[in-house]
A protein has these predicted regions:
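Non-transmembrane domains of secretory- and envelope-associated proteins
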Residues: 2-6, 111-115, 121-129, 136-184
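Flexible, surface-exposed loop/linker segments and immediately adjacent secondary-structure boundaries
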Residues: 81-113
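Short, solvent-exposed coil/turn segments at beta-strand boundaries
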Residues: 43-51, 60-66, 111-113, 134-141, ...
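Short acidic, glycine-rich loop/turn motifs
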Residues: 30-35, 70, 121-123, 146-148
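N-terminal mature ectodomain segment of secretory-pathway/periplasmic proteins
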Residues: 8-68
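Short, surface-exposed charged micro-motifs
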Residues: 40-42, 57-58, 107, 129-133
């Protein structure tokens, strides 16, 4: 990776961070393709808190605790939140936060108004590549792809807007009929 390429990709990452920060609390809709599996979902972010809805599952987090609700199995799993995780399906509060020295970055492709960056963790324990596609004009993230060995998860961000209502929060009273498994 050349220093010039790294500077350019870091400038794009800063622009993405500024775009997302300017939204404040926000809602996103997305589609996911992982092998033969295709689905759509949505998530909301307010500071370190988030709420994700995909198929018959919901995930709530207050930034410290993660509550995974499986409506099909009528089960709630409770665990500590991994605040360092940057996977959009695990911690959308940090899924576009790559500014700094934790990830090496370079411009991978450019097509029209889109620019795709290749991101690779500097920590060798964190394997895999991340491809982040953003609008070069305004910094809006459009797509994020996670590649680990033969596995590939593609997430297209179909909408990203400032949140207008109250953030959904986990309420144990809604799940009295569910089995609750606490891993904390």
């Amino acid at each position: 990776m050349s220093a010039k390429a790294d500077e350019r990709s870091q400038a794009v990452l800063r622009r993405v961070a500024e775009y997302v920060k300017a939204l404040g609390e926000y809602d996103a809709h997305f589609s996911v393709v992982a092998g033969d599996y295709t689905t759509q979902g949505r998530y909301s972010v307010a500071g370190d808190a988030y709420h994700i809805v995909v198929d018959q599952a919901e995930v709530y987090s207050d930034g410290k605790t993660r509550y995974e609700v499986d409506h099909d199995r009528k089960e709630v799993n409770i665990d500590e939140m991994d605040v360092n995780n940057r996977n959009i399906m695990d911690n959308p509060t940090r899924c576009f936060d790559f500014v700094g020295d934790e990830y090496a970055s370079m411009v991978w492709t450019e097509l029209g108004e889109n620019i795709t960056l290749l991101l690779r963790a500097n920590d060798t324990v964190l394997e895999g590549d991340i491809y982040l596609t953003v609008n070069r004009n305004n910094g809006r993230p459009n797509r994020i792809v996670y590649v680990l060995y033969e596995d590939r998860i593609e997430v297209d961000i179909t909408s990203l807007e400032r949140r207008k209502g109250a953030m959904p929060k986990f309420e144990v009273s809604k799940y009295r009929e569910y089995e609750i498994v606490d891993f904390r």
